[in-house]
Amino acid sequence: MTASQDAPVPPAMGPKIAIIGAGPAGCMLARLLQRANVSVTVFESEASLDFRSQGGTLDLHTSTGLLAMKEAGLWDEFLEHARYDGQYIAWVEQHARQHFVMGASGARSDVQERPEIDRAQLRRILAASLPEGMIKWDHRLRRVEAPNTLVFDTLMTSDFDLVVGAEGAWSKVRKFMKPDVDPTYTGIGLYELSIPNASATAPELYTLVNRGSVFGHADGKRLSIQQMGDGSLNIYTSSLKDEADWMRPEKCGHDTSDLAAAKEALMEEYRDWDSTITDAILKASGACKTRSLYMLPVGFRWEHHRGVTVIGDAAHLMGPFAGEGVNVALEDAMRLAASIIAAAKNTENGKETLDQQVEAFEKEMFPRMEKVQRLTDELMHDYFHTPGVPQSIMARVLTRHVKFSTPAILHPLATLGVHSYMFLNSLASRWR
Protein backbone atom coordinates (compact mmCIF):
# COMPACT_ATOMS: atom_id res chain seq x y z
CA MET A 1 0.00 0.00 0.00
CA THR A 2 1.49 3.35 -1.03
CA ALA A 3 1.41 6.60 0.93
CA SER A 4 -1.62 7.86 -0.96
CA GLN A 5 -3.47 4.59 -0.27
CA ASP A 6 -2.85 4.41 3.48
CA ALA A 7 -6.03 3.47 5.31
CA PRO A 8 -7.60 5.98 7.74
CA VAL A 9 -6.41 5.59 11.33
CA PRO A 10 -8.30 6.09 14.59
CA PRO A 11 -7.58 9.09 16.85
CA ALA A 12 -3.95 9.36 17.89
CA MET A 13 -2.83 7.70 21.09
CA GLY A 14 -0.20 8.15 23.74
CA PRO A 15 2.31 11.00 23.98
CA LYS A 16 2.14 14.22 21.98
CA ILE A 17 5.27 14.76 19.92
CA ALA A 18 6.59 18.03 18.47
CA ILE A 19 9.18 17.83 15.71
CA ILE A 20 11.15 20.96 14.87
CA GLY A 21 12.20 20.91 11.22
CA ALA A 22 10.58 19.41 8.12
CA GLY A 23 13.75 18.11 6.51
CA PRO A 24 14.29 14.43 5.70
CA ALA A 25 14.87 13.39 9.32
CA GLY A 26 11.92 15.33 10.73
CA CYS A 27 9.50 14.22 8.03
CA MET A 28 10.64 10.61 8.27
CA LEU A 29 10.08 10.59 12.03
CA ALA A 30 6.65 12.17 11.57
CA ARG A 31 5.70 9.64 8.89
CA LEU A 32 6.67 6.66 11.03
CA LEU A 33 4.83 8.02 14.08
CA GLN A 34 1.74 8.93 12.08
CA ARG A 35 1.57 5.40 10.66
CA ALA A 36 1.64 4.09 14.23
CA ASN A 37 -1.16 6.46 15.25
CA VAL A 38 1.00 8.62 17.55
CA SER A 39 0.08 12.31 17.86
CA VAL A 40 2.70 14.42 16.07
CA THR A 41 3.08 18.01 14.88
CA VAL A 42 5.94 19.29 12.72
CA PHE A 43 7.03 22.93 12.94
CA GLU A 44 9.04 24.30 9.99
CA SER A 45 10.59 27.76 9.71
CA GLU A 46 10.31 27.89 5.92
CA ALA A 47 7.10 29.24 4.42
CA SER A 48 6.55 26.31 2.05
CA LEU A 49 8.07 23.09 0.77
CA ASP A 50 9.78 24.83 -2.17
CA PHE A 51 10.76 27.99 -0.28
CA ARG A 52 14.43 27.54 -1.21
CA SER A 53 16.75 25.27 -3.15
CA GLN A 54 17.30 21.96 -1.34
CA GLY A 55 20.81 21.11 -2.49
CA GLY A 56 22.19 18.30 -4.59
CA THR A 57 21.85 14.55 -4.85
CA LEU A 58 21.98 11.88 -2.14
CA ASP A 59 22.78 8.19 -2.21
CA LEU A 60 20.72 6.11 0.20
CA HIS A 61 22.20 2.94 1.68
CA THR A 62 20.68 -0.49 2.17
CA SER A 63 20.61 -0.81 5.96
CA THR A 64 19.87 2.84 6.81
CA GLY A 65 18.22 5.25 4.36
CA LEU A 66 16.65 2.61 2.12
CA LEU A 67 15.44 0.57 5.08
CA ALA A 68 13.80 3.69 6.51
CA MET A 69 11.94 4.31 3.23
CA LYS A 70 10.63 0.75 3.34
CA GLU A 71 9.61 1.05 7.00
CA ALA A 72 7.78 4.27 6.13
CA GLY A 73 5.77 2.53 3.40
CA LEU A 74 7.28 4.81 0.75
CA TRP A 75 9.31 2.32 -1.24
CA ASP A 76 7.22 2.54 -4.40
CA GLU A 77 7.32 6.35 -4.33
CA PHE A 78 11.08 6.21 -3.85
CA LEU A 79 11.57 3.85 -6.79
CA GLU A 80 9.75 6.27 -9.08
CA HIS A 81 12.58 8.77 -8.58
CA ALA A 82 15.59 6.64 -7.60
CA ARG A 83 18.49 6.56 -10.06
CA TYR A 84 20.24 3.20 -9.87
CA ASP A 85 22.33 4.22 -12.87
CA GLY A 86 23.49 7.16 -10.75
CA GLN A 87 25.76 4.91 -8.67
CA TYR A 88 28.69 5.57 -11.02
CA ILE A 89 31.55 7.38 -9.22
CA ALA A 90 34.94 8.38 -10.58
CA TRP A 91 37.81 9.93 -8.60
CA VAL A 92 40.17 11.91 -10.82
CA GLU A 93 43.17 14.16 -10.29
CA GLN A 94 43.48 17.72 -11.55
CA HIS A 95 44.70 16.58 -14.98
CA ALA A 96 41.55 14.44 -15.38
CA ARG A 97 43.34 11.11 -15.00
CA GLN A 98 41.11 8.56 -13.31
CA HIS A 99 42.43 6.91 -10.15
CA PHE A 100 39.41 4.88 -9.11
CA VAL A 101 36.04 4.15 -10.69
CA MET A 102 32.95 2.43 -9.34
CA GLY A 103 30.66 1.49 -12.22
CA ALA A 104 26.91 1.88 -12.05
CA SER A 105 25.01 -1.39 -11.85
CA GLY A 106 21.90 0.09 -13.43
CA ALA A 107 19.85 -2.44 -11.49
CA ARG A 108 18.66 -3.18 -7.99
CA SER A 109 20.61 -5.50 -5.73
CA ASP A 110 19.34 -7.42 -2.71
CA VAL A 111 22.81 -7.28 -1.10
CA GLN A 112 24.08 -3.71 -1.37
CA GLU A 113 22.61 -0.74 -3.19
CA ARG A 114 23.26 2.99 -3.13
CA PRO A 115 20.81 4.59 -5.59
CA GLU A 116 20.79 8.37 -6.00
CA ILE A 117 17.86 10.70 -5.44
CA ASP A 118 17.72 14.49 -5.42
CA ARG A 119 17.50 15.84 -1.88
CA ALA A 120 14.56 18.03 -2.88
CA GLN A 121 12.69 15.03 -4.28
CA LEU A 122 13.33 12.93 -1.18
CA ARG A 123 11.98 15.71 1.02
CA ARG A 124 8.98 16.13 -1.28
CA ILE A 125 8.13 12.41 -1.04
CA LEU A 126 8.34 12.48 2.75
CA ALA A 127 6.40 15.72 3.21
CA ALA A 128 3.66 14.63 0.79
CA SER A 129 3.16 11.44 2.80
CA LEU A 130 2.01 13.42 5.85
CA PRO A 131 -1.62 14.45 6.41
CA GLU A 132 -2.48 17.98 5.38
CA GLY A 133 -1.88 20.38 8.25
CA MET A 134 0.59 18.19 10.13
CA ILE A 135 3.45 20.45 9.03
CA LYS A 136 3.06 23.96 10.41
CA TRP A 137 4.89 26.04 7.83
CA ASP A 138 6.35 29.47 8.61
CA HIS A 139 6.89 28.63 12.29
CA ARG A 140 10.39 29.77 13.20
CA LEU A 141 11.50 28.51 16.60
CA ARG A 142 13.32 31.25 18.49
CA ARG A 143 14.21 29.34 21.63
CA VAL A 144 13.25 26.58 24.01
CA GLU A 145 12.56 27.56 27.62
CA ALA A 146 12.48 25.28 30.65
CA PRO A 147 10.88 22.92 31.17
CA ASN A 148 10.06 22.37 27.46
CA THR A 149 8.31 25.50 26.24
CA LEU A 150 8.59 26.29 22.53
CA VAL A 151 8.82 29.99 21.71
CA PHE A 152 8.04 30.82 18.08
CA ASP A 153 7.73 34.24 16.46
CA THR A 154 3.96 34.33 17.02
CA LEU A 155 3.31 31.39 19.33
CA MET A 156 4.36 29.94 22.67
CA THR A 157 3.38 26.40 23.63
CA SER A 158 4.17 23.75 26.23
CA ASP A 159 1.63 21.30 24.88
CA PHE A 160 3.96 18.40 24.06
CA ASP A 161 5.38 15.43 25.93
CA LEU A 162 8.48 15.27 23.73
CA VAL A 163 10.20 17.87 21.58
CA VAL A 164 12.51 16.50 18.87
CA GLY A 165 14.96 18.91 17.28
CA ALA A 166 15.54 17.98 13.63
CA GLU A 167 16.25 21.51 12.42
CA GLY A 168 19.85 21.11 11.36
CA ALA A 169 23.16 22.78 12.09
CA TRP A 170 21.98 25.70 14.22
CA SER A 171 19.37 23.78 16.18
CA LYS A 172 17.63 25.80 18.90
CA VAL A 173 16.62 22.55 20.58
CA ARG A 174 20.26 21.45 20.83
CA LYS A 175 21.18 24.92 22.11
CA PHE A 176 18.69 24.45 24.96
CA MET A 177 20.18 21.06 25.83
CA LYS A 178 23.85 21.96 25.37
CA PRO A 179 24.21 25.77 25.38
CA ASP A 180 28.01 25.78 25.56
CA VAL A 181 28.64 23.89 22.28
CA ASP A 182 28.20 25.36 18.79
CA PRO A 183 29.27 23.98 15.40
CA THR A 184 32.82 24.90 14.43
CA TYR A 185 34.11 25.92 11.01
CA THR A 186 35.90 23.10 9.19
CA GLY A 187 38.16 25.43 7.21
CA ILE A 188 36.42 24.51 3.95
CA GLY A 189 34.28 26.81 1.84
CA LEU A 190 32.43 25.99 -1.34
CA TYR A 191 30.65 27.39 -4.36
CA GLU A 192 27.56 25.69 -5.76
CA LEU A 193 26.87 26.08 -9.49
CA SER A 194 24.55 24.38 -11.97
CA ILE A 195 24.47 23.41 -15.64
CA PRO A 196 20.83 23.03 -16.79
CA ASN A 197 19.92 20.53 -19.53
CA ALA A 198 23.49 19.25 -19.54
CA SER A 199 23.07 16.72 -22.35
CA ALA A 200 22.48 19.66 -24.72
CA THR A 201 24.46 22.48 -23.09
CA ALA A 202 27.52 20.49 -21.96
CA PRO A 203 27.49 17.11 -23.74
CA GLU A 204 31.14 16.30 -22.98
CA LEU A 205 30.62 16.82 -19.25
CA TYR A 206 27.34 14.93 -19.38
CA THR A 207 29.18 11.95 -20.89
CA LEU A 208 32.05 12.27 -18.40
CA VAL A 209 29.70 12.10 -15.42
CA ASN A 210 27.93 9.04 -16.88
CA ARG A 211 24.72 9.85 -14.94
CA GLY A 212 26.64 9.59 -11.67
CA SER A 213 29.37 11.66 -10.04
CA VAL A 214 32.93 12.74 -10.76
CA PHE A 215 35.14 13.98 -7.93
CA GLY A 216 38.28 15.87 -8.93
CA HIS A 217 41.02 16.41 -6.34
CA ALA A 218 44.26 18.31 -5.97
CA ASP A 219 46.07 19.58 -2.88
CA GLY A 220 43.50 21.39 -0.75
CA LYS A 221 40.89 21.53 -3.51
CA ARG A 222 37.96 19.51 -4.77
CA LEU A 223 35.66 19.92 -7.77
CA SER A 224 32.66 17.63 -7.95
CA ILE A 225 30.17 17.20 -10.79
CA GLN A 226 26.94 15.32 -10.08
CA GLN A 227 23.99 14.34 -12.24
CA MET A 228 20.60 15.53 -11.02
CA GLY A 229 17.22 13.99 -11.71
CA ASP A 230 16.09 16.85 -13.96
CA GLY A 231 19.05 16.41 -16.33
CA SER A 232 21.12 19.23 -14.87
CA LEU A 233 24.60 18.90 -13.40
CA ASN A 234 25.34 20.20 -9.92
CA ILE A 235 28.84 21.63 -9.50
CA TYR A 236 30.60 22.07 -6.16
CA THR A 237 34.04 23.61 -5.80
CA SER A 238 35.48 23.12 -2.31
CA SER A 239 38.76 24.48 -1.01
CA LEU A 240 40.53 25.55 2.15
CA LYS A 241 39.51 29.01 3.33
CA ASP A 242 41.02 30.76 6.34
CA GLU A 243 37.82 32.23 7.72
CA ALA A 244 34.18 31.19 7.74
CA ASP A 245 33.08 34.52 6.24
CA TRP A 246 35.53 34.20 3.36
CA MET A 247 32.74 35.03 0.87
CA ARG A 248 32.50 38.67 1.98
CA PRO A 249 33.57 40.89 -0.97
CA GLU A 250 36.25 42.63 1.08
CA LYS A 251 37.85 39.24 1.80
CA CYS A 252 37.51 37.33 -1.47
CA GLY A 253 37.76 40.34 -3.78
CA HIS A 254 34.48 39.91 -5.66
CA ASP A 255 30.72 39.61 -5.32
CA THR A 256 30.18 35.86 -4.91
CA SER A 257 26.55 36.15 -6.03
CA ASP A 258 27.72 37.51 -9.40
CA LEU A 259 28.16 34.41 -11.57
CA ALA A 260 30.58 36.06 -14.01
CA ALA A 261 32.79 37.34 -11.19
CA ALA A 262 32.66 33.98 -9.43
CA LYS A 263 33.62 32.14 -12.62
CA GLU A 264 36.61 34.41 -13.13
CA ALA A 265 37.78 33.86 -9.55
CA LEU A 266 37.27 30.09 -9.75
CA MET A 267 39.06 29.75 -13.08
CA GLU A 268 42.01 31.54 -11.50
CA GLU A 269 41.88 29.28 -8.44
CA TYR A 270 41.70 26.17 -10.65
CA ARG A 271 44.05 27.46 -13.35
CA ASP A 272 46.30 24.38 -13.10
CA TRP A 273 43.42 21.97 -13.69
CA ASP A 274 42.57 20.29 -16.98
CA SER A 275 39.86 21.96 -19.02
CA THR A 276 37.96 18.66 -19.11
CA ILE A 277 37.04 19.40 -15.49
CA THR A 278 37.07 23.20 -15.34
CA ASP A 279 34.60 23.34 -18.24
CA ALA A 280 32.07 22.62 -15.49
CA ILE A 281 32.75 26.12 -14.17
CA LEU A 282 32.63 27.80 -17.57
CA LYS A 283 29.40 26.07 -18.64
CA ALA A 284 27.51 26.94 -15.43
CA SER A 285 24.54 29.28 -15.60
CA GLY A 286 21.93 30.67 -13.24
CA ALA A 287 22.47 31.20 -9.53
CA CYS A 288 25.82 31.06 -7.76
CA LYS A 289 25.76 30.12 -4.08
CA THR A 290 28.46 29.96 -1.45
CA ARG A 291 28.69 28.53 2.03
CA SER A 292 31.12 27.39 4.67
CA LEU A 293 31.08 23.87 6.09
CA TYR A 294 30.63 23.37 9.82
CA MET A 295 30.76 20.37 12.11
CA LEU A 296 30.01 19.36 15.67
CA PRO A 297 32.86 17.81 17.68
CA VAL A 298 33.51 14.15 16.95
CA GLY A 299 31.90 12.24 19.79
CA PHE A 300 29.53 15.08 20.70
CA ARG A 301 26.95 14.10 23.28
CA TRP A 302 24.76 15.63 25.96
CA GLU A 303 23.23 14.90 29.33
CA HIS A 304 19.74 13.54 28.94
CA HIS A 305 16.95 16.14 29.28
CA ARG A 306 13.48 14.87 30.02
CA GLY A 307 11.06 15.72 27.22
CA VAL A 308 13.58 16.84 24.60
CA THR A 309 16.10 15.28 22.19
CA VAL A 310 17.69 15.87 18.78
CA ILE A 311 18.37 13.83 15.64
CA GLY A 312 20.12 14.25 12.29
CA ASP A 313 22.39 17.25 11.76
CA ALA A 314 21.09 18.77 14.98
CA ALA A 315 22.73 15.85 16.80
CA HIS A 316 25.80 15.08 14.69
CA LEU A 317 26.49 17.77 12.11
CA MET A 318 29.36 16.72 9.83
CA GLY A 319 30.75 17.36 6.38
CA PRO A 320 29.54 15.52 3.26
CA PHE A 321 32.73 13.54 2.69
CA ALA A 322 31.55 10.09 3.80
CA GLY A 323 28.11 10.27 2.17
CA GLU A 324 26.51 9.09 5.40
CA GLY A 325 24.79 12.23 6.75
CA VAL A 326 21.26 11.75 5.45
CA ASN A 327 21.49 7.99 5.93
CA VAL A 328 22.33 8.21 9.62
CA ALA A 329 19.66 10.93 10.01
CA LEU A 330 17.00 8.63 8.57
CA GLU A 331 18.29 5.83 10.78
CA ASP A 332 17.96 8.17 13.79
CA ALA A 333 14.34 8.81 12.83
CA MET A 334 13.65 5.10 12.41
CA ARG A 335 15.15 4.17 15.77
CA LEU A 336 13.59 7.05 17.69
CA ALA A 337 10.19 6.27 16.18
CA ALA A 338 10.46 2.69 17.41
CA SER A 339 11.27 3.96 20.91
CA ILE A 340 8.34 6.39 20.96
CA ILE A 341 5.92 3.81 19.60
CA ALA A 342 7.00 1.33 22.27
CA ALA A 343 6.33 3.95 24.95
CA ALA A 344 2.94 4.82 23.45
CA LYS A 345 1.78 1.26 24.04
CA ASN A 346 2.27 1.68 27.79
CA THR A 347 -1.02 3.30 28.79
CA GLU A 348 -0.42 3.13 32.57
CA ASN A 349 2.97 4.82 32.85
CA GLY A 350 3.39 6.31 29.40
CA LYS A 351 5.35 9.49 30.18
CA GLU A 352 7.88 7.73 32.38
CA THR A 353 8.27 4.97 29.81
CA LEU A 354 8.70 7.59 27.07
CA ASP A 355 11.52 9.25 28.99
CA GLN A 356 13.24 5.91 29.55
CA GLN A 357 12.88 4.97 25.89
CA VAL A 358 14.29 8.30 24.67
CA GLU A 359 17.24 8.08 27.04
CA ALA A 360 17.96 4.55 25.83
CA PHE A 361 17.75 5.78 22.23
CA GLU A 362 20.31 8.51 22.96
CA LYS A 363 22.72 6.07 24.61
CA GLU A 364 22.53 3.86 21.52
CA MET A 365 22.90 6.82 19.16
CA PHE A 366 26.05 8.31 20.72
CA PRO A 367 28.54 5.55 19.73
CA ARG A 368 26.75 4.96 16.44
CA MET A 369 27.00 8.59 15.38
CA GLU A 370 30.56 8.95 16.70
CA LYS A 371 31.64 6.21 14.31
CA VAL A 372 30.19 8.14 11.37
CA GLN A 373 31.58 11.46 12.58
CA ARG A 374 35.05 9.98 12.91
CA LEU A 375 34.96 8.49 9.42
CA THR A 376 33.83 11.82 7.97
CA ASP A 377 36.51 13.76 9.85
CA GLU A 378 39.25 11.35 8.74
CA LEU A 379 38.13 11.53 5.11
CA MET A 380 38.02 15.34 5.25
CA HIS A 381 41.64 15.37 6.39
CA ASP A 382 42.58 12.81 3.74
CA TYR A 383 41.04 14.84 0.93
CA PHE A 384 42.07 18.35 1.97
CA HIS A 385 45.22 18.01 4.08
CA THR A 386 47.24 15.30 2.32
CA PRO A 387 49.79 16.03 -0.43
CA GLY A 388 49.43 14.22 -3.74
CA VAL A 389 45.70 13.54 -3.65
CA PRO A 390 43.91 11.55 -4.89
CA GLN A 391 46.61 9.01 -5.78
CA SER A 392 48.23 9.23 -2.35
CA ILE A 393 45.03 8.49 -0.46
CA MET A 394 42.85 6.17 -2.54
CA ALA A 395 43.88 2.96 -0.76
CA ARG A 396 43.48 4.67 2.61
CA VAL A 397 40.07 6.12 1.71
CA LEU A 398 38.73 2.81 0.41
CA THR A 399 40.08 1.00 3.47
CA ARG A 400 38.29 3.45 5.76
CA HIS A 401 35.00 2.87 3.95
CA VAL A 402 35.39 -0.92 4.00
CA LYS A 403 36.30 -0.96 7.71
CA PHE A 404 33.30 1.24 8.47
CA SER A 405 31.00 -1.34 6.90
CA THR A 406 32.58 -4.53 8.30
CA PRO A 407 33.06 -6.04 11.78
CA ALA A 408 36.38 -5.24 13.48
CA ILE A 409 37.46 -8.88 13.32
CA LEU A 410 37.50 -8.62 9.52
CA HIS A 411 39.48 -5.37 9.32
CA PRO A 412 42.90 -6.97 8.63
CA LEU A 413 41.38 -9.00 5.79
CA ALA A 414 39.56 -5.93 4.48
CA THR A 415 42.78 -3.90 4.47
CA LEU A 416 44.63 -6.65 2.60
CA GLY A 417 41.81 -6.91 0.09
CA VAL A 418 41.77 -3.19 -0.66
CA HIS A 419 45.54 -2.96 -1.11
CA SER A 420 45.57 -6.05 -3.33
CA TYR A 421 42.80 -4.58 -5.44
CA MET A 422 44.60 -1.25 -5.77
CA PHE A 423 47.83 -3.00 -6.77
CA LEU A 424 46.10 -5.04 -9.48
CA ASN A 425 44.20 -1.97 -10.64
CA SER A 426 47.49 -0.08 -10.94
CA LEU A 427 49.03 -2.86 -13.02
CA ALA A 428 46.01 -2.99 -15.29
CA SER A 429 46.06 0.77 -15.85
CA ARG A 430 49.62 0.59 -17.17
CA TRP A 431 48.48 -1.69 -19.98
CA ARG A 432 45.53 0.46 -21.04
Could you tell me what each predicted segment is?
Residues 2-17, 22, 32-36, 59-198, ...:
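Conserved N-terminal helical subregion
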Residues 49-53, 244-247:
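A short acidic, helix-capping loop that chelates divalent metal ions and anchors anionic groups
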Residues 170-171, 190-192, 220-224, 315-316:
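Histidine-centered metal-chelating micro-motifs
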Residues 45-49, 55-58, 65:
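Glycine-rich active-site loop/strand segments that organize a redox cofactor
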Residues 53, 175-176, 321:
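Conserved catalytic-core motifs of eukaryotic protein kinase domains, centered on the activation segment
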